[in-house]
Amino acid sequence: RRQRQMCIRDREKGYAVIKDWKSQDVIALDMDMPVEIVAADPHVKENFGKRAIQRGPLVYCMEEIDNPEYFDQIQLSPSTTFQTAFVSDILNGIKTIKTNGRAQSATFIPYYAWDNRKAGKMRVWIPYNE
């Protein structure tokens, strides 16, 4: 199968327009998806001392179903490491993030995928220990 790459420079009202579509045309979006620890705006007092995990443009969350034993004790730190893994049995497949923290490890899923298995706690903003 032949693949072509297109660079779209012309835009109509802010949108890229490709007028001549064929049934075999495919648009592939390829972007870096690094895992990062991000902070909230400092004006959000409720998130002081907490951080979230983001992979590319996706925000991740922690669900109790994946972290039942240590859900309320999990913390992030500058030394936290991350591993991504594909899990096929949630919403036809998602990338999870596993952390290895000082005291315990945790599993995070994309925010869009939460509340699709079992009722329980969910958290985006995780205590951060510098």
What is the meaning of each model-derived region?
Residues 3-8:
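Short, small-residue-biased leader/transition segments that mark boundaries at the very start
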